Amino acid sequence: MNKKFTDLAKKSKVIVIKVGSNILVNEKHTLRKKWLATLVDDVQKLQKKGSKVIIVSSGAIALGRDILSKKKLTNLHEKQAAASIGQIQLSQQWQKAFAKLKIQSSQILITAEDLNERRKYLNIRNTIFSLMDLNVVPIINENDTTSTEEIRFGDNDKLSAMITNALSAELLILLSDVDGLYTANPKKSTQAKLITDVTEINHDLEKYIDKDLSEFGSGGMQAKVNAAKLCIQSGSTMIISNGLVNNPLGNIHPKSSTWFLPSKNILTSRQQWIWNRPIQKAILHIDEGAAKALKKNSSLLAIGVKAIEGRFYRGDT
């Protein structure tokens, strides 16, 4: 492992690793078992250095589609059916890979609604902490079978960032089919240059984002940068690195990946939860004075509210 990455990993008590469908599943739509074994080997090395590791794994829909012999899933219900079939195989393969190294793993399926409700959010967080205390590696995925179109995470990049925030993890690693964020799509332009360090996500940076989605995934680079926004506000480092190689964690290098560095202005745990909630039930429009007050962590007074969209209920935040 590269020294800079090794030093960061040593300082990271909790590390979240997101594995996308496009690197977990090959062009024949089957699981890359040999590659998975090398990733699990990397995870064990991180554990031996003292880090707790959480995996956010896509792949259920892609695997289920192959089992159903469907070239294309045309609607949400077909995707949910594929997910319910593929999730069993996905979980089994993770369990087998970790078991070979005598590491216990577990499965957690989460919906956006689970993280939107404070009580459920805290319960999920406490469950994951308990699993980590038992040296169990949680394998997390969105519960695609029960999620609805209107209230889905949409991509596991966002889910992994929210898990990172919930656990106050120091590091999130997004394993992708590209090295990181480029000034242009490297698959389309020979002039594309890799951006290795990002200290601020602004308009100048976002203009480089290619809007294309992956074949199996639903996010693309835009989703990864959105995930980075969530991470850096909570004081976490996020790395986008090429996961197609064997031992993908061992091959992370600062010159061939993109590192999003933590913001100096870190939100509190509750502020992170409010800011990152996947479901917004209603919207408050406030005046300039109220906006300035909130930026200083002052209270919002009724006089500063100009309009309300939707409906708030008791307990909403």
Question: Predicted segment positions?
Answer:
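C-terminal catalytic "cap/lid" subdomain
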Residues: 1-104, 108-317
